[in-house]
Design a protein with these regions (language model features):
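S-adenosyl-L-methionine
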Residues: 1-42
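SAM-dependent methyltransferase catalytic-core segment centered on the flexible catalytic loop
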Residues: 14-19, 23-24, 40, 54-71, ...
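Conserved class I S-adenosyl-L-methionine
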Residues: 45-55
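The conserved SAM/SAH-binding core of class I Rossmann-like methyltransferase domains
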Residues: 75
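Conserved SAM/SAH-binding beta-strand->alpha-helix loop
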Residues: 78
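Conserved SAM-binding loop
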Residues: 85-86
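Conserved hydrophobic residues forming the short capping helix/wall of the S-adenosyl-L-methionine
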Residues: 89
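Short, conserved active-site loop motifs that form the nucleotide-linked donor/cofactor pocket
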Residues: 95
Length: 152
């Protein structure tokens, strides 16, 4: 299986490195995405999935190719990448894509599964400091400046 499929390859060619760095965009290799999707679908009762760092939707593309009746909600903060992703899910009624920071949204919804490869940057590099205090409040804990999205 190739490292990136055509969708990711085209995006990488068209988006500047500066833009991709700004949003900490590094794409999950298909073999790893497939492994993660297979693991998630090991739950026979899987009906709803959250993909909070949607990007181009590699996980959702794989999940829906295996189980087309899943209801998936995806979030991304980059309008450019979400615009590209929406082209590939056009007409897919089981997909809801949001141009929002999932860190501020969806706290009250529940999902059967969550799948993502969050952008890797430390909170001290994060430009929306109010997110940190909101997360600390909701989780009742203090995060240090070296915490990254993988921790959450």
């Amino acid at each position: 299986m190739e490292q990136l499929n055509n969708i990711e390859s085209i995006y990488v060619q068209n988006a500047t490195m500066e833009h991709r760095k700004q949003y900490a965009q590094f794409f999950t290799p298909l073999a790893i995405a497939q492994l993660m999707a297979d693991w998630l679908l090991g739950n026979d009762k899987m009906e709803t999935v959250l993909e909070p760092a949607f990007g181009l939707g590699v996980f959702s593309r794989i999940l829906l190719s295996i189980k087309s009746n899943l209801l998936i909600k995806g979030f991304d903060i980059d309008e450019m990448i979400l615009h590209e992703a929406k082209k590939h899910f056009e007409g897919c009624k089981s997909m809801k894509l949001m141009l929002q920071d999932y860190m501020f949204n969806d706290w009250n919804n529940k999902y059967d599964g969550i799948i993502c490869n969050p952008p890797y940057f430390k909170f001290h590099d994060y430009d929306n400091k109010s997110v940190i205090s909101e997360i600390e409040r909701k989780l009742s804990c203090k995060l240090n400046g070296f915490t990254n999205l993988y921790t959450l």
